[in-house]
Amino acid sequence: MNTQQLFREITQEQIKSDVPAFRPGDTVRVHVKVVEGTRERIQLFEGVVIKRHGGGISETFTVRKISYGVGVERAFPLHSPRVAQIEVVRYGKVRRAKLYYLRNLRGKAARIKEIRR
């Protein structure tokens, strides 16, 4: 067994199977496990997916939201044990894979059309 096969076998065990299908433009609610001292709690982060990057075990996605008038972006590893759950709230219709242009838009201009699924 060579190293590529070994690497593939190890990463296959770590990949989550309960990840919903979502794309850039979709609004998601990410349940993140946060450890504070000895306590562990779930923190929600809801926003628009502006990009997905990579593949396999190292795949990440970035979510953007506006909090108190300030844009906040957070990148999450898709298969991380810290990500407890991902819920798709809305499906958006966009024609780009990377939605960096949303960083420059404010208010109603930053809206994304919704697809009914």
UniProtKB/Swiss-Prot annotation:
Keyword Ligase: no
Keywords, ordered alphabetically: Ribonucleoprotein, Ribosomal protein
SUPFAM superfamilies, per database record: Translation proteins SH3-like domain
GO CC terms in record: cytosolic large ribosomal subunit
Gene Ontology MF terms in the entry: structural constituent of ribosome
GO biological process: translation
PANTHER family per record: LARGE RIBOSOMAL SUBUNIT PROTEIN BL19M, RIBOSOMAL PROTEIN L19
Full protein name: Large ribosomal subunit protein bL19
Taxonomic placement: Bacteria, Bacillati, Bacillota, Bacilli, Bacillales
Encoding gene (name): rplS
